[in-house]
Amino acid sequence: GTVLPGIEVRIGDENEILVKAPTVMRGYHNKPEATAEAFTADGWFRTGDAGYITADGAIVLTDRIKDLFKTSNGKYIAPQAIESRLGEDKYIDQVAVIGDKRKYVTAIIIPAFEALKEYEKKKKIAYKSIEELVRNADIRHMIEERIEKLQKGFAGFEKIKKFTLLPNAFTMESGELTNTLKIRRSIINRRYSREIEAMYV
């Protein structure tokens, strides 16, 4: 969006949007620790949002800082931006991007099963179960090619290097989704640790 008159904006560490203005609070009453967390050392208010400023001065939000993670190479990744991009594909239903403190980015992907079954019919792929279908080499190759195209605008360190297809969707009932249908990253990391570790071998 456009910056309002009288408000200064700059981009800080981790691409955090920082603001300074007479209308911004000066701190929390009798809470010096909370105030120190909310402001930089030189008095800029931390919004908690990551983003950038365009050439014409507009602000673009990309993610919440708390949702960012850092690879072992020190690069910050905005997983939701990658998940949203991949989720645009008709063969991909859900995505959980992995990569916190790891060398590269991977993903657990839930295919859009109805679209996948149509593809399987067209290509005459024989399978006995959904588990078998997601392990099929032709299916994996097709998804891989589509991921490559979807990632074209990403920096090299943001690109998914490996992925795992799961035969079951993330659900609220299983605890893998919040009631607003956002993925619970910590639960997915724990529940699918074996599949995740296999992508880093």
Identify the residue ranges that each predicted region occupies.
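Conserved adenylate-forming
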Residues: 2-14, 22, 101-104, 111-123, ...
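Conserved ATP-binding/catalytic segment of the ANL
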Residues: 3-71, 88
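Generic recognition of flexible, low-complexity loop/linker segments
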Residues: 6-8, 57, 83, 93-96, ...
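Solvent-exposed alpha-helical segments within well-ordered globular domains of core cellular machineries
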Residues: 13-14, 33, 37, 80, ...
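C-terminal boundary motif of the adenylate-forming
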Residues: 50, 89-115
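Conserved C-terminal "lid"/linker of ANL adenylate-forming enzymes
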Residues: 94-97, 144-201
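Adenylate-forming
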Residues: 24, 58-87, 116-137, 156-160, ...
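Acidic/polar alpha-helix N-cap and adjacent early helical turns
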Residues: 128-140, 192-201
